[in-house]
A protein has these predicted regions:
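Short, well-structured alpha-helical segments in soluble
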Residues: 52-74, 89-93, 210-219
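PAS/LOV and related PAS-like sensory modules
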Residues: 374-384
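An alpha-beta-alpha
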Residues: 7, 131-188, 297-309
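Periplasmic-binding protein-like
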Residues: 9-10, 68-80, 99-103, 166-171, ...
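Membrane-proximal low-complexity regions enriched in glycine and acidic/polar residues
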Residues: 186, 194-295
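Hydrophobic alpha-helical segments within soluble ligand-binding/sensing domains
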Residues: 108-113, 118-134, 142-164, 272-289
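Alpha-helical transmembrane signal-anchor helices
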Residues: 330-374
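Hinge/cleft segment of the Venus flytrap/periplasmic-binding protein
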Residues: 287-348
Length: 384
């Protein structure tokens, strides 16, 4: 609609990236179905490794400067951790505050570094929580925010491995990796008896991290945070975590983020991830229809405990010892579940064959009886 200010979606990554693409397409489809009237504009920050972090605030300012004055957006949607952090880093300079929604983001953030920060690879920022630290963001009207439960993961791994003395935390060279590492450092202060070993992708390649993993001390448990980009800014898929797994066959691994779950990690306490595109569209329509609503409609995506049943069996663990409920994934499928369709097809075929046999036998005996009666009648007539 030409007379309405547009909705501006600012993505951290290329909109063609799977999670971003699914979220945007679900959002646009649902927004259209709900009768949304605004045009939708998509801008992409194309964030990669953490070495670019000092530039993101300027990129956000540049994007927003294109939509000033009469062209200012009716809503701003921030997709991804980097876009969310970049917005927070420069929101004070914005002349017009429009309603903001964040998604694919988490409650724990780190304030983006300034250009003056030297040695980003060894920079140890403080973890800030938008709820616990009471950040004042009046224009944030809606959001879908993941919360990570590091304490829950430590409780899980200590229940299974009470002799644990060291936790090796793996994080990569991305904003997500740095924020999760900052959260782990903050949460580990609650466990002074545990030693935290940081396996930091800002300082490691996949090859050097594998070498470090081979030399971990006894009574260590690995916590896999995230691994997508290493210090050389090379991108990795699942094969990287397989290489790490092969280097540490005798060390158990857990994950607070679902990375390596199903291949390497035994389990973890992780956000109950779900598709939120449709819910975002409903929120956009609500924000338009209720402009006077000043309440924050923030949907916090809580955590659930998950264990890979194949890994549980492989490591000889008993999920019942955990002090909380747990969801088992990759459970072995029974013969009936695996071949339900074939079993029912075979049963149906058997029933049809039995019915066919019964009908054939009925007509066979009926015909035989009639023939016998005819022969008897013929015999009686001859006698007469």
């Amino acid at each position: 609609s030409k007379d309405k200010n547009p909705i501006l979606i600012i993505c951290s990554y290329n909109p063609a990236a799977h999670q971003t693409s699914v979220t945007i397409s679900d959002y646009m489809e649902e927004y259209g179905k709900l009768g949304g009237q605004r045009d939708i504009i998509i801008e992409n920050m194309n964030c990669k490794s953490f070495s670019e972090a000092p530039l993101w605030s300027g990129m956000m300012t540049q994007i927003l400067s294109k939509y000033q004055g009469e062209k200012h957006p009716g809503q701003i949607i921030l997709l991804g951790q980097e876009a969310w952090a970049a917005y927070l880093s420069q929101r004070d300079s914005m002349q017009i505050k429009v309603p903001v929604m964040c998604s694919l983001a988490s409650s724990n953030i780190v304030i983006l570094p300034k250009d003056t920060v030297k040695n980003l690879d060894s920079w140890m920022p403080e973890s800030v929580d938008i709820f616990a630290d009471h950040m004042d963001i009046p224009e944030l009207e809606s959001g879908f925010i993941n919360q990570y439960d590091i304490e829950g993961n430590i409780r899980m791994l200590r229940t299974f491995y009470p002799k644990t003395e060291h936790i090796a935390f793996i994080s990569d060279n991305t904003y997500g990796g740095v924020t999760m590492q900052a959260l782990v450092r903050k949460e580990m202060e609650k466990f002074p008896d545990l030693d935290l070993i940081l396996m930091d992708g800002r300082k490691h390649t996949i090859y050097t991290i594998v070498e470090e993993l081979r030399h971990l001390p006894e009574n260590t448990v690995i916590m896999v945070g995230t691994w997508r980009v290493d210090m050389n800014e090379g991108y990795f898929m699942r094969n990287a975590t397989y290489a790490m797994m092969e280097a540490t066959p005798a060390i158990p691994a857990f994950t607070p983020s679902s990375v390596s779950l199903g291949s390497w990690a035994i389990g973890g306490v992780l956000p109950d991830y779900r598709k939120v595109g449709k819910e975002m569209a409903q929120e956009s329509v609500r924000m338009d229809s209720q402009p006077g609503d000043t309440a924050k409609h923030l949907s916090v995506i809580g955590c659930k405990a998950v264990l890979d049943s194949r890994k549980v069996k492989e490591w000889g663990l008993n999920p019942k010892v955990l002090p909380f409920d747990v969801q088992l994934i990759n459970q072995p499928v029974s013969f009936y579940q695996q071949y339900t369709y074939q079993i029912w097809s075979a049963c149906a075929l058997f029933v049809i064959l039995v019915l066919g046999l019964c009908i054939s036998l009925f007509y066979y005996f009926r015909t035989k009886r009639l023939r016998d009666e005819l022969l008897k009648s013929e015999k009686d007539l001859r006698v007469a």
